[in-house]
């Protein structure tokens, strides 16, 4: 540690979670009393995913470690092997790097390994986006498990704050500060967007981003077929696909999308996008089609509709701009047609938005850092609710 500076770490394994945290991280990084380390892992370091860690270097952050993992998403068993590898590597890293506070966002399987390693080393964890529900994916139980390993919590709605408390967390350590992503997308730097993304004709394309459902038993190939069948109905619009994550069976989706793009002149694929470029695409598109959480949390702030497919996001609080459909080509097409008719008229109501979210995250983190040494002297206790069921 350098002098009296508080040492804060942030573990990131994907383009998405880094993008959500970026503005908040900048505030921490600019604070002379904080030494911020970015600990990278997972898909960020993979050549297959475009080595997205370069986006972090480009933004000027200090990357303290690149914890490489063997990524094989062909089965849940292979994902578990990756988690085991991650646990060992994070255990060694945290043994040598005893942070005052570790920031963990969300529910990725790599984050579960990082959280367990940190908790075993008695490193206090601040968990962001806890309490949420996503019944179609193993993120659901991973998220709640990380909550129990964490001492502090920033939730994105009051409903989620109450759920974290229901899990036995002390209300004095659980804060509803809104979702960073719901604010970040309104602060994009359009001057930072160049190339093929900037050349797309505004309001003449769909953004497509979909990931596997890992808990419902729905066939991933059939999911892909249904959405691609629906997209066949829009030859006069550009179809802009965004790279899939590293969940189980994601390579099957990637292969289907690659084949579709190769055979359709109106389709393009971006594996690796800077946060500003992604938000630019959303802002100027007709709607987001797929099952990404950004369609629930970020797209409403930008005033565009979301065609949310399947059960991956089932359980999340959502605004009126989100249209839920099943894995059926006809349903998907009908919702996309409604999105075309409604385009530009939905307003910007978003249940996840709170003004000055990044600043509020920063100020609350300073408050936590001022008491973390005293807090960690005592083991975290289970907070019992005075209710009978």
Model feature map: region roles:
Residues 56, 191-286:
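Donor-nucleotide binding loops and adjacent catalytic segments primarily
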């Amino acid at each position: 540690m350098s002098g009296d500076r508080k040492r804060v770490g942030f573990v990131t394994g994907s383009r998405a979670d880094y993008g959500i945290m970026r503005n908040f991280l900048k505030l921490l990084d600019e604070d002379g009393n904080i030494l911020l380390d970015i600990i990278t892992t997972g898909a960020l370091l993979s050549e297959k995913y475009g080595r997205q860690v370069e986006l972090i270097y480009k933004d000027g952050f200090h990357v303290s470690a690149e914890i490489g993992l063997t990524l094989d998403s062909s089965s849940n068993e292979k994902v578990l092997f990756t988690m085991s590898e991650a646990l060992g590597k994070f255990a060694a890293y945290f043994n040598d790097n005893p942070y005052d506070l570790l920031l963990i966002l969300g529910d990725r399987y790599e984050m579960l390994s990082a959280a367990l390693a940190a908790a075993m080393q008695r490193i206090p964890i601040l968990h962001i986006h806890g309490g949420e529900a996503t019944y179609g994916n193993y993120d659901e139980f991973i998220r709640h498990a990380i909550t129990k390993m964490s001492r502090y919590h920033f939730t994105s709605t009051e409903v989620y704050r109450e759920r974290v408390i229901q899990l036995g967390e002390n209300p004095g350590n659980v804060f509803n500060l809104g979702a960073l992503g719901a604010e970040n997308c309104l602060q994009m730097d359009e001057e930072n967007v160049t190339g093929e993304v900037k050349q797309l004709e505004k309001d003449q394309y769909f953004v497509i981003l979909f990931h596997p459902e890992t808990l419902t038993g729905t066939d991933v190939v059939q999911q892909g077929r249904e959405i691609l069948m629906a997209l066949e109905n829009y030859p006069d619009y550009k179809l802009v696909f965004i790279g899939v994550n590293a969940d189980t069976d994601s390579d099957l989706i990637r292969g289907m999308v690659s084949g579709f793009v190769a055979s359709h002149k109106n389709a393009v694929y971006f594996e690796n996008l800077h946060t500003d470029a992604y938000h630019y695409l959303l802002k100027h598109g007709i709607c987001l089609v797929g099952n990404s959480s950004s369609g629930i949390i970020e797209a409403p702030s930008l005033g565009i509709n979301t065609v949310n497919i399947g059960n991956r996001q089932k359980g999340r609080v959502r605004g009126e701009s989100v249209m839920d459909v099943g894995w059926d080509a006809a349903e998907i097409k009908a919702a996309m047609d409604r999105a075309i008719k409604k385009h530009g008229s939905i307003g910007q109501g978003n249940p996840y938005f709170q003004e000055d979210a990044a600043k509020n995250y920063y100020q609350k983190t300073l408050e936590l850092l001022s008491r973390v040494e005293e807090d960690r002297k005592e083991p975290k206790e289970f907070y019992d609710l005075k209710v009978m069921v």
